Amino acid sequence: VIRDHPDMILREKHFASIQINWNDKAQNLKQIADEINIGLSSIVFFDDDKLNQERIKQEFPEVLTIEIPNDPSQYSSILTNLNDFNVLQKTEEDTKRGEMYAQQRQRKQFENTVSNLDQFLKQLDIKVKIKKSNEFLIPRISQLTLKTNQFNLTTRRYQEEEIRKFSKDENFTVGCVQVLDKFGDNGVTGAYVVKKNGTSWILDTFLLSCRIIGRGVEDAMLSHILKDAKNNGIKEFKAEFIPTSKNKPAENFLSEFGFEKQDKFWVYNLNNNIKSPNHLMVEIE
């Protein structure tokens, strides 16, 4: 029907993920989340079947399940009145989100055609652009600190004015990363804040969108930050991991990179070699 019906307005290209089958709705929701690489808490479930509504509530309480009235004429007003889709300000990434999800589906399909992860990463032709904060990027950096939960070392939340203040302060470095590959532009998907305390720098904030985790971008980001510290004569670089109920994907990142635990901080000795991923290209702007 979607592909061939002459009166169908929506076509396959308008959907980020399509699950049309007889499978359980909960299973399909999980498949959608996996396919376009988003958290279940980012999904809204709108279904007129009360049994399906209850099933999703029990299986995935983090999914927003909408209570649907019996009268179909009220459906559009319910969606229109949902505050969950409202935002104070749209970033460039927001306007391209549907396109980005479609690209993510293509990446997933491509991944299934290659024999191993290393081959997949090399053939993606990943380019990482590391950018310093500026007035144009501040809204997106703030948005990432407010919304990113999974790969987020400290989960510190910063409003735009706070990011703007850090960006103008010589005792801070604020930056972000834009990630591109053969399928398209993922947009600005990572951010960091470094606090400079004399001869010791501290990684205040370090985060990456869950859509990009596992491609080596996090290693490229941290490698750049550490090299910057080393080039500025810093001998000791500190970082924190503050555990939450959602950031387990970032739990072992610092130790695996070579940091050692000292009291509440993780410390990297900048006399050591700093590793960098070799399957992607890094561009400093």
Task: Annotate each language-model stretch with its function.
Residues 1-20:
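Substrate-recognition/cap helix-loop segment adjacent to the acidic, metal-dependent catalytic center
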Residues 129-211:
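A conserved beta-strand-loop-helix scaffold within acyl/acetyltransferase catalytic domains
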